[in-house]
């Protein structure tokens, strides 16, 4: 049913009943019509004043908004045109401390409110009959509801809609929280690289170049796939097969050029990347002697790194990382020198490094092994004599046992397949130190690294891989390992000022949490009968990725 906003009275100018006893009826009708016209003109003038008053108010608010916008534009234009790029007018701290912009314009969201009720409708409402006085019964109700709302409640439908919207918003937030929890529990899937489309023209171009170049392109494609999807295990097995069967039909001379170059590149990468490989000993030979080709045998991987001889020099350069090797495991004390030599000549056990010379000999000249003539390790190799002419290439090191995987220079002979596969396994890791010794203490390491002069030093005195090796120090600086630990009472006691400061910091953190909680509760309580606020809150919950109450920022912009 439409509501009549303005009603012009009287409707009918001449439609009136003439009273009895009037002699001149025509004059009476004329006077009544003129009076009704005047009444209509008065009502029209009144409504015109209402209409123009509303227009004036709208124009005034519009002009105020336009003027404020013009002032902001003028300020921005001045700051933009006269901005000096060399001067920093706004610091980073001001940017972070400044609050977000909040509009102060009140939007007309509730059109049918008592405050926005027009004056003619208010007059019409006042003419209507009053509802029954049910508010008298409100103090006697136990549920606290108004008695008149059971008879008439203008906000019933809006309250019903608001309750439904808020419930839907809360349900969506719970659903998002459950979905996020499922995503956290689910393991992260690796990104898949899409498969390239099949191109027949490129295949024909590869075949036109030749089988060798086509194979190189295929290897390059495999490398690109390996870089994109991670290293694969089956790409590394083929070069190892060629290396393990050097004496068979898979030798380097029988391979095509593309496979040979790929094999050499991979072998060089493996040699350069290994961090625990020790540097090879410097070769000793005369001017006219033929230099042996170094072949590095690694006990940690069980592979033979080999490179073909270059036609110019007849040697193969092997690049090894200069990182120090890990120390060998300790040997039992019951082993003697003869058993050590016997175990060195046998194949199954891992090679044991030779014991270092005395400190005096080590300081005079470095221990450089002579060029080995036979294949088997002679007894003299364990205790080599330093040559008188060779200058020291490396600084003398303290009498600490060298690591087991040392690259020895031996003549290159093709090893049978059985010997290559039967290489000894890598040595086990060194045992942990006893509970009374701290591995991180350099004093204990120094005391252990220098045994008494009467005893022969053994390789078992090497520290763990995480303990740094220290040069020998004078006896006056050596502190015994049985040093008493510091008592906890010698540590500085925390003063009362520090404890008070820590307690104040904790209280400040708790107060900050309470303030944030109160702010969130105030934001929840601030939502009133505002349609735009409720809708914006629901939209923010639907399109937000986080569980925070970031949807309340939309409310600030609408206020």
UniProtKB/Swiss-Prot annotation:
InterPro entries: SCAR/WAVE_fam (IPR028288), WH2_dom (IPR003124)
GO molecular function, one term: actin binding
Domain (WH2) ranges: 497-514
Omega-N-methylarginine PTM positions: 341
Biased composition (Low complexity): 333-346
Region called Disordered, residue ranges: 170-202, 304-383, 412-490
Composition skew (Polar residues), residue ranges: 304-313
Keywords: Actin-binding, Cell junction, Cytoplasm, Cytoskeleton, Methylation, Phosphoprotein, Synapse
Gene Ontology biological process: actin cytoskeleton organization; cellular response to brain-derived neurotrophic factor stimulus; lamellipodium morphogenesis; mitochondrion organization; positive regulation of Arp2/3 complex-mediated actin nucleation; receptor-mediated endocytosis
Principal localisation: cytoplasm
Cellular component, GO annotation: cytoskeleton; focal adhesion; lamellipodium; SCAR complex; synapse
Bias (Basic and acidic residues): 182-202
Record comment regarding domains: Binds the Arp2/3 complex through the C-terminal region and actin through verprolin homology (VPH) domain.
Role noted for this protein: Downstream effector molecule involved in the transmission of signals from tyrosine kinase receptors and small GTPases to the actin cytoskeleton. Promotes formation of actin filaments. Part of the WAVE complex that regulates lamellipodia formation. The WAVE complex regulates actin filament reorganization via its interaction with the Arp2/3 complex. As component of the WAVE1 complex, required for BDNF-NTRK2 endocytic trafficking and signaling from early endosomes. Also involved in the regulation of mitochondrial dynamics.
Family (UniProt): Belongs to the SCAR/WAVE family.
Protein name: Actin-binding protein WASF1
Gene coding for it: WASF1
